[in-house]
UniProtKB/Swiss-Prot annotation:
Protein's UniProt keywords contain Secreted: yes
Top-level taxon of origin: Eukaryota
GO cellular component labels: extracellular region
Main location: secreted
Keywords, in A-Z order: Amidation, Neuropeptide, Secreted
Name of the protein described by the UniProt record: Tachykinin-related peptide 4
Subcellular location: Secreted
Task performed by this protein: Myoactive peptide. Increases the amplitude and frequency of spontaneous contractions and tonus of hindgut muscle.
Taxonomic source organism: Rhodnius prolixus (Triatomid bug)
Residue positions, PTM Arginine amide: R10
Any one Gene Ontology BP term: neuropeptide signaling pathway
Amino acid sequence: TPSDGFMGMR
């Protein structure tokens, strides 16, 4: 999940 640390949507 690349967006896990960013927003956690993917």
